[in-house]
């Protein structure tokens, strides 16, 4: 079992907790999944902190469970499946990094919610691709990756269509980019400097 101090060493104090009440809040949801309490909850705020957390967990063979939406949860996918798993709460990673009206693209962190993005888009006369009855505190990325059904199929090819590209941290801590985010350029910022919008050419 990994210690609280080991995670604090990579992301700092105040963002790792073993408080029994907090752990209990992640142990069950509104599904039929059997409850299981995590060992710790860590709350990174940057990509580099996520990488550090994943690398540490990989080295120690600790299982991680990402959570990006606020409660309540319903599918059982935020409940640990094994003993001593660690919750990675991504709700503090809630920056809207970029909105491009011309290409209808928003670049968001995993903790950005429908309520948060919709308020920003309305200022520019746009709206998000909204699934059926989303909670205001539901993570946009979480909803799209869970393939929640859309109410406007006219504007989407399939349930994964809204994700034009992504930046992922895989199990060993390596960062990879998908879709239009693969390049050219080493970073999303490099792409934007030359007019890139992180979309594949055929994306509508």
Language-model segments: which ranges?
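Glycine-rich N-terminal segment of FAD-binding domains in flavoprotein oxidoreductases
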Residues: 23, 28-93
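Conserved oxyanion/phosphate-binding beta-strand-loop segments in alpha/beta enzyme cores
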Residues: 6-28
């Amino acid at each position: 079992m990994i210690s609280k101090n080991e995670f604090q060493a990579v992301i700092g104090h105040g963002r790792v907790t073993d408080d029994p009440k907090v752990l209990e809040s992640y142990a069950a949801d509104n599904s039929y999944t059997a409850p299981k309490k995590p060992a710790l909850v860590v709350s990174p705020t940057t990509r580099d902190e996520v990488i550090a957390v994943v690398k540490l967990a990989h080295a120690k063979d600790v299982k991680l469970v990402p959570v990006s939406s606020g409660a309540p949860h319903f599918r059982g996918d935020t409940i640990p499946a094994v003993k001593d798993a660690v919750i990675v709460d991504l709700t503090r990673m809630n920056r809207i990094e970029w909105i491009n009206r011309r290409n209808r693209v928003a670049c968001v962190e995993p903790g950005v919610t429908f309520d948060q993005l919709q308020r920003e888009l309305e200022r520019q006369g746009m709206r998000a691709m909204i699934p059926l009855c989303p909670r205001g505190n539901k993570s946009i990325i979480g909803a799209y990756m869970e393939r929640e059904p859309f109410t406007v199929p006219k504007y989407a090819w399939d349930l994964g269509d809204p994700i034009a590209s992504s930046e992922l941290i895989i199990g060993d801590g390596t960062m990879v980019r998908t879709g239009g985010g693969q390049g050219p350029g080493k970073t999303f910022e490099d792409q934007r400097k030359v007019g890139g919008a992180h979309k594949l050419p055929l994306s509508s």
